[in-house]
Amino acid sequence: MARMVQCIKLGREAEGLDFPPLPGELGKKVYENVSKEAWQAWLRHQTMLINENRLNLADSRARQYLTQQLQNYFFGTGADMPAGFVPPSV
């Protein structure tokens, strides 16, 4: 049976992650509070941030920026959007 969590992003109970996605306390917090669906949405957002901001993940500042954005996305006021981003029309 799937592990269920009260997802902090979706605001409802949903299937939880299979394992902590990051090491340390942040990984544990994400594992306990974020659903698979919300994690997939974060991965899409993270990819957009990496591509649009041309982040080099070999640079520790880029990794720190993404970690801060992850914390904002799930536990804060929301992550940044790339400059000039226009959401696609549905």
UniProtKB/Swiss-Prot annotation:
Pfam families: Iron_traffic (PF04362). GO terms for molecular function: iron ion binding. The keyword Iron applies. GO terms for biological process: cellular response to oxidative stress. One of its GO terms (cellular component) is cytosol. Signal peptide: none annotated. Keywords: Iron. The keyword Iron applies. NCBIfam families: PRK05408.1. Could be a mediator in iron transactions between iron acquisition and iron-requiring processes, such as synthesis and/or repair of Fe-S clusters in biosynthetic enzymes. Belongs to the Fe(2+)-trafficking protein family. PANTHER family: FE(2+)-TRAFFICKING PROTEIN-RELATED. This is Probable Fe(2+)-trafficking protein.
